Amino acid sequence: MTAIKKTITYGQHELTLETGEIARQADGAVMVSYGDTVVLVSVVGKREVKEGQDFFPLTVDYQEKTYAAGKIPGGFFKREGRPSEKETLTSRLIDRPLRPLFPEAFYNEVQVVATVMSSDPEIDADIPAIIGASAALAISGIPFYGPIGAARVGYINGEYVLNPTASQLKETALDLVVAATESAVLMVESEAKELPEDVMLGSVVYGHEQMQIVISAINELAAEVGKEPWDWAPPEPNTELIAKVEALAGADINEAYKIKSKSARSSKLDEIRSRVLGELITETTSTSEANEIKSIFHNLEAKVVRSQILNGEPRIDGRDTRTVRPISIRTGVLPRTHGSALFTRGETQALVVATLGTGRDEQIIDALQGEYADRFMLHYNMPPYATGETGRVGTPKRREIGHGRLAKRALLAVLPSQEEFGYTIRVVSEITESNGSSSMASVCGGCLSLLDAGVPLKAHVAGIAMGLIKEGNRVAVLTDILGDEDHLGDMDFKVAGTESGITALQMDIKITGITAEIMRVALSQAKEGRLHILGLMKEAVGEQPQELSEFAPRIITMKINPEKIRDVIGKGGAVIRALTEETGTTIDIEEDGTIKIGCTSAEAGEEAKKRIEAITAEVEVGQVYDGTVLKLLDFGAIVSLLPGKDGLLHISQIAHQRVNAVADFLKEGQVVKVKVLEVDDKGRVRLSAKALIEAPSAEAPEEPAVAATGADQQ
């Protein structure tokens, strides 16, 4: 049981790849250590293909164990349950660059499992997990055109930073993850603070250059301990069958792709496909042969669409390569929501709703690095009817979680700070029609709904999806791609941003040979399309946000001395409970003394604020108060000045004349005017009533006299 290790310095920490000791029954298993973050990645592939399988069943599961951070799971069962959003997003992040590197027609089931076993709070486990998956596949013998490397790139003070720590990410203007083979970038995922195109492209190139050391280390590991490659070869093309399908359907497919309506085009293609299958499938045809016919038909579709575009012919819906589909914008479409927008771009449509809440509505996330609150949520839903299909409705799928996260990244850079706008914000994008680029429609609709709700965004944000088709030296970059162009093309390239720069970038490339120059052209063309959409958005809603929705809660923010927090809360929470119940508000108090009062009416909020001010007010020397007599003593009286603030009115300070009995001048419950003479270093307050009463003349008869207010003045 000999462990083989490869250790390199990668960025600010050492990266170690270790295999041969743990999980030896997997086809490939690598323990990746990066700083104190440790991830075990295993790969298993099935040698036999399931009968009738017509797609590649790759499964990637990234899982975080709470013991990795020295924690015990919360809840009743005390064990890890369903995947968190972070686990789902990281699973997708690993899957996306791996999937294009398996051979075409390889349909054996492959499962990648990445388990976080130790978590350094400064080092995210996603980069080690991608590297581990690449290394495990490289040594497994499973057909795989890797390995790949991965890098996180930050941008701090005008400099690129390789694999920035969690602390550095708080300062960075960019958080970009790039994965690539030795020669080609495959995947980019990023969010940025309105950075220009050349900085974004430079970060991709920088990350690709830096990860070469990782790819070399994986190659060395595979050369040393790699298993015998599988005896697998792609099936020989059935030229006779291809010719038959082309003869039966080629011309008809060509005509079908001149139909601009998606539903009409799909119906026509279904009809052609059914006719071809009907003519070529007999009772003796096996499932695998039937699947081969379907695959040939699909490849023929791709050939038709790609050749039309590369030959300079109009695209499927009649556009040229740079034109954005017609756009329709409506805001305020739902009467009782806080903000809403209907964004339609061609046959893609998003109904997006913004809701404002108080601090109590923040999402509490129990992450490995510790618990934190998220004040901005964006949820993306795409029901089956959006594509004219039936299907399951309910729990969001991985794709929906990923698209929601991308749209959220795009809008984060323009949100007002907590101090500027104290609301919790939730945006929900309901995709009601889909024919390409629904996540970018969610960005546009999300921005519009936030403006409709009255959120003071720093700038308008729009998103656009780009595509690419490449055959040899012929390249076509497509603006605002359709679903078919995404499916049949070589690249899906989503860019969101403001007039000033990019806020989110996501790229998935299915082929090699995409150069930096091609990416530069795509980014430039995307900017052109983005600015066009931003112009239409501003035309529709103007530059400024609407007034805050009348249905949104009002939030009043005030600041008190942190030492007074306990006075506002009261013993056992009695004071704050009474405040919220009597005023109908919600009150959130932070450790620094910031208080946020959430209310449905301004009057209720002001009443709560007034009462908190009274509770936290300080007694000032020389000030006059209307005090209530709480208790009579032999030597004076205890007078309440403010909630929780009492003072002593000494018998000598009640009146100018001699006072033999306090009860002759005061009674409990009486309201009297008193002046604060002194507050000593222990907080004791000395009061005077006679200081507010004119001294009697020498001839005046002696009688009880004390300044009274309100009902006490008789």
UniProtKB/Swiss-Prot annotation:
EC number: 2.7.7.8
Record keywords: Cytoplasm, Magnesium, Metal-binding, Nucleotidyltransferase, RNA-binding, Transferase
Transferase as UniProt keyword: yes
Name of this chain's protein: Polyribonucleotide nucleotidyltransferase
Family annotation (SMART domains): KH, S1
Cofactors: Mg(2+)
Ranges for domain S1 motif: 622-690
